UniProtKB/Swiss-Prot annotation:
Gene3D superfamilies named in the record: Aspartate/ornithine carbamoyltransferase (3.40.50.1370)
Assigned protein family: Belongs to the aspartate/ornithine carbamoyltransferase superfamily. OTCase family.
Location of this chain's protein in the cell: Cytoplasm
Function summary: Reversibly catalyzes the transfer of the carbamoyl group from carbamoyl phosphate (CP) to the N(epsilon) atom of ornithine (ORN) to produce L-citrulline.
GO cellular component terms, A-Z: cytoplasm
Record-level GO BP terms: arginine biosynthetic process via ornithine; citrulline biosynthetic process; L-arginine biosynthetic process
Source taxonomy: Bacteria, Pseudomonadati, Pseudomonadota, Gammaproteobacteria, Methylococcales
Protein name: Ornithine carbamoyltransferase
Enzyme class: transferase
Classification via NCBIfam families: orni_carb_tr, PRK00779.1
Length: 298
């Protein structure tokens, strides 16, 4: 039987997505020891450095009674040019699950195609589904179901934005995206999402009456050479107190971190009462524990 993978949110049904959110909330509240993954091993392949992804997966496996192995390009033949499919075949004969944080989304797709065990997308250039599990858990904890609500995405139409496009369809919320011309999410993703997703360039229109406001860095890892150009393009796309004032009175603010205060978000908003970024960061642990349990014990 082929394993279940988590390459994008589209690998889940709406019901499964909601069940994972509920399970993550339950696991967060659980105090007594619980080790459903005893003697299981998670292989973690990192092409890009990370704080939250590595720590949350390692701690999650330890709390579940399992263990994890960290593999950087220096530690594997992948870094020396071994075909991706060969690495997938070999690793999946030795570990129980593989998580990859890579540059190219195609790398994760190939791993999933050739792996004998579940493959998890820990982040690629196109999608970041693990972060959306945590984001949605955080919203449900603070405000209840997100169905019928309005989410405003401000800034780059990047991997996070594109994962929000998937989430909007699965959880039935309205997504309004405001980004500079030339930085929109992939057109085919937006078209496939239908009426629940709108793309424009005016931040005020996007945020007006929103229940959740989300942003991300202007230049992601690997885009450092574009920093000056992007700073100019995004200068009018900062989430600050004046912009948040246009949102719903009890709107929340999220950012997947790390944040650059004074660029994509003001320090006042990041540290303010509407910000739930620290809960959001913590929930990477709980949401991914729910995901690991789902993939490895079903």
């Amino acid at each position: 039987m082929k394993p279940r993978h988590f390459v994008t949110l589209r690998d889940l049904s709406s019901a499964e997505f909601r069940a994972l959110i509920a399970r993550a909330i339950d696991l967060k509240a659980r105090k007594e020891p619980y080790e459903p993954l005893k003697n299981k091993v998670l292989g973690m392949v990192f092409e890009k450095s990370s704080t939250r992804t590595r720590v949350s997966f390692e701690v999650g496996m330890a709390q579940f009674g399992g263990s994890s192995i960290f593999l950087s390009p220096r530690d594997t033949q992948l870094g020396r040019g071994e075909p991706i499919e060969d690495s997938a075949r070999v690793l999946s004969r030795m570990v129980d699950c593989i998580m990859l944080r890579t540059h190219a989304h195609r790398t994760v797709e190939i791993f999933a195609e050739y792996s004998r065990v579940p493959v998890i997308n820990g982040l690629t250039d196109r999608f970041h589904p693990c972060q959306l599990l945590a984001d949605m858990q955080t919203y449900f904890e603070h405000r209840g179901d997100i169905a019928g609500k309005t989410v405003a995405w401000i800034g780059d139409g990047n991997n996070m934005c594109q994962t929000y496009v998937h989430a909007a369809g699965l959880l039935d919320f309205r997504l309004r995206i405001a980004c500079p011309p030339g930085y929109e999410p992939e057109a085919e993703l937006v078209e496939a999402a239908g009426k629940c997703v709108e793309v424009g360039h005016d931040v005020r229109t996007a945020v007006n009456g929103a229940d959740l406001v989300v942003t991300d860095v202007w230049a992601s890892m690997g885009q450092e050479s574009e920093q000056t150009e992007r700073t100019g393009a995004f200068r009018d796309y900062q989430v600050n107190a004046a912009l948040m004032a246009l949102a719903h009175a009890d709107a929340l603010f999220m950012h997947c971190l790390p944040a650059h205060r004074g660029e994509e978000v003001s320090a006042e908003v990041l540290e303010g009462p509407q910000s739930v970024v620290w809960d959001e960061a913590e929930n990477r642990l709980h949401a991914q524990k729910a995901l690991l349990e789902f993939l490895l014990t079903a």
